[in-house]
Amino acid sequence: NGKNILRIEDTDQTRKVEGAVDNVISNLSLLGIEFDEGPVQGGDSGPYYQSERLDIYKKYCDELIKSGAAYYAFDTPEELDEMRKLQQLEGRQTMYDRRARDLSMNEVSENLKSGKPYVIRLKVPLNEEIRFDDLIKGTIKIDTNNIDDQILLKSDGFPTYHLANVVDDHLMKITHIIRGEEWVTSVPKHILIYRALGWEVPH
């Protein structure tokens, strides 16, 4: 009795290919795969292009900021590149060093007023263990100290996959998620976002 929803995940504008969405819809139709909701049919959960849902993602990002579950980061590309090079030189894991986690409200306000570009990052709690059950792999445990403070909202105002999918999966009432192997390590980040927003984590 579930619904089949087609959602177009087009938040990475650098990889946008003209005509690709039409090809996807056409090929799925040729395979006999039909949708209850989507860009063609419409429905209660629209819009179905993530690029048309930016205000929705911004709203929830603001909630995460207010609750202390996310923060502004004003690092330049050059600063981030220097940070990664130093980590590699020292043989450390390459990840954000959380330098912007503890910026004061005044510092954030001044940076915003000056128009300094920013991203919004997930404030991953330290020294915790995230557990989740995978139907294939069983129980998986991840130390939060090894989880990057993931970017949620990019400097261009577009969300990353992590924020957009959590928000959309919740609002579209998705109950079960099938992931590729490469996305399993992202599950703890998604769980943290669900928790911070007070939402139930899907299976």
Write out the residue ranges for each language-model feature.
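Active-site cores that bind ATP or allylic diphosphates and position pyrophosphate for catalysis
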Residues: 66, 71-203
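N-terminal Rossmann-like or analogous alpha/beta NTP/dinucleotide-binding catalytic cores
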Residues: 1-90, 144, 158, 185-203
